[in-house]
């Protein structure tokens, strides 16, 4: 739908090997700092995701953190190299359809079990490892009749470019019934 609105497009992605490990190590360490005491005192009252992150963070050692740092640096370089070749990357905002709020996470995608509760978010968190500028736009509905979104990414500090591309794409998407922003029927939601 929107490829024709760019001078050139190409399919590809940066090498994000080990990105999941790096993200999960840093996430776990952060959760220990932010929520460790809370988990020690109130483990039974907290979400299983908070508890999982703290437990995961406590299980890592300094070598794990050092390796995660090297992995993150490689991934950031790969993203930055890609942003030398292209102005923006456009990809789905999530790997799944929206799911019920009482479901803590996605356990599997396309019959592949997720190794951790957060793995389904990889398409969103991997670009953050390079501090990518990002915007998320609604882009119609998916095959399950649920809202679908795309993310527009560029190099760190290119927020203005990302916003300009997002605005232009928003106008293009709004002109096609299949990609226009879905407006919920509020009467159905309140009945």
What kind of region is each of these model predictions?
Residues 2-13, 176-183:
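Flexible, glycine/charged-enriched surface loops at secondary-structure junctions
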Residues 88:
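Short, Asp-centered acidic motifs that coordinate Mg2+ and/or phosphate
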Residues 56-70, 77, 85, 128-191:
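Structural helix-boundary/capping segments
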Residues 16-18, 96-99:
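Short, active-site-adjacent cap segments at secondary-structure transitions
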Residues 52, 76, 105, 120-121:
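Tryptophan-centric aromatic hotspots in well-structured domains and transmembrane helices
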Residues 117-130:
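Hydrophobic alpha-helical segments in the ANL/AMP-binding
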Residues 21-26, 67, 99-120:
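Short, surface-exposed loop/helix-turn segments at secondary-structure junctions
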């Amino acid at each position: 739908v929107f490829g024709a609105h760019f001078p050139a497009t190409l399919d590809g992605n940066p090498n994000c090997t080990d990105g999941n490990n790096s993200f999960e190590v840093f996430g776990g360490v952060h959760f220990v700092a932010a929520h460790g005491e809370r988990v020690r005192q109130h483990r039974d009252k907290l979400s299983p995701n908070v508890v999982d992150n703290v437990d995961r963070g406590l299980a890592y050692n300094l070598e794990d953190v050092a390796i995660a740092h090297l992995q993150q640096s490689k991934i950031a370089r790969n993203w930055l190299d890609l942003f030398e070749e292209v102005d923006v990357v456009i990809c789905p905002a999530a790997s799944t359809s929206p799911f019920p709020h009482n479901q803590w996470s996605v356990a599997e995608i396309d019959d592949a079990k997720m190794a951790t509760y957060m793995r389904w978010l990889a398409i969103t968190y991997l670009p953050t490892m390079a501090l990518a500028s990002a915007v998320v736009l609604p882009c119609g509905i998916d095959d399950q009749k649920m809202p679908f979104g795309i993310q527009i990414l560029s190099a760190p500090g290119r927020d203005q470019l990302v916003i300009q591309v997002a605005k232009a794409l928003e106008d293009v998407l709004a002109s096609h019934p299949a990609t226009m922003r879905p407006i919920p029927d509020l009467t159905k939601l309140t009945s």
